[in-house]
A protein has these predicted regions:
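Conserved ABC ATPase "signature" region
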Residues: 72-76, 121-139, 190-191
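Conserved ABC ATPase "signature" C-loop
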Residues: 222-223
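ABC ATPase "signature
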Residues: 228-229, 237
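Conserved ABC ATPase signature
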Residues: 143-147, 151
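A short, proline-enriched helix->beta-strand linker immediately N-terminal to the Walker B motif
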Residues: 162-166
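ABC ATPase NBD coupling module
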Residues: 74-91, 115, 234-238
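Short coil-to-helix segment of the ABC ATPase nucleotide-binding domain corresponding to the Q-loop/switch region
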Residues: 103-112
Length: 254
């Protein structure tokens, strides 16, 4: 199996085993997301969700395990493969949104395509289509440092979609949005996943996001999977007090 060179082809599934040591505990997460599938990762603060995102994105190295997109190897600790983020072919939105502050929303969204060699005009046109899709067309010329939290989050999502990623890894991408914008942007993401046949790993605190988007949900606590199944299955038999609180039921053992 060879290391990936550039973006993996659209239509490939994501297969990963993430082992990352974190002080008193370690993340140990196995996930498989088919092309066009959505896996939602839920859990309390400090449970390992953002560490999983960082490991998938190439922001922290694996102590053991691998990340594969189809037949392409993005990381393999045993084989010494660890591609940098820009070579993984992923569309990533981090919980702490990172935009280039002095660039406009349009320039931020077009940045990846320009860096890949696309000419300025088509890159801008593509960026404008995505900004319109996420409801940010009126702020295309606004510098990123002047965007509100919700606007910056939508710009970051548009930037992730703009590079035609082979997979999406989104960490709390709707957290700063109001209810109307949240539903609209969720629909944009769902349409992209369905039409482009890309796998999506969605980290969220909101069960509604998981119910609306995900085929499968897993719950992480202290780096370990404590429950896995279809979104509606969580309410039937919550495995921990956190899951019971999430679904609005009595605690385990009550």
């Amino acid at each position: 199996m060879r290391a990936a060179r550039g973006a993996a082809g659209v239509g490939a599934g994501l297969d990963a085993h993430l082992v990352v040591r974190r002080g008193a505990w370690q993340l140990d997460l196995r996930l498989v997301v088919p092309a066009g599938g959505v896996l939602a990762v839920l859990g309390p603060n400090g449970g390992g969700k953002s560490t999983a995102v960082a490991a998938l994105a190439g922001l922290v190295p694996l102590d053991r395990g691998h990340v594969r997109l189809g037949e392409r190897v993005l990381a393999d600790a045993e084989a010494g493969v660890d591609l940098p983020p820009e070579r993984r072919g992923l569309g990533v939105v981090l919980q702490d949104v990172l935009l280039v502050p002095h660039l406009s929303a349009r320039e931020n969204v077009a940045f990846g395509r320009r860096a890949a060699g696309e000419r300025a005009r088509p890159a801008r046109q593509h960026a404008d289509r995505l900004l319109e899709a996420v409801g940010l067309a009126a702020h295309a010329r606004t510098r990123a440092e002047r965007l509100s939290g919700g606007q910056a989050q939508r710009a970051a999502l548009a930037r992730a979609l703009a590079v035609d990623p082979a997979a999406l890894v989104l960490d709390e991408p709707f957290a700063a949005l109001d209810a109307h914008a949240r539903r609209h942007v969720r629909d944009v993401v769902a349409d992209h996943v369905r039409t482009r046949r890309v796998p999506l790993v969605l980290v969220t605190h909101a069960l509604d996001d998981a119910r609306d988007l995900a085929d499968e949900v897993l719950v992480l606590e202290r780096g370990r999977v404590v429950q896995r199944g279809a979104p509606d299955d969580l309410a039937d038999a919550p495995a921990t007090d956190y899951v019971a609180e999430l679904v609005g039921g009595p605690g385990v053992g009550s």
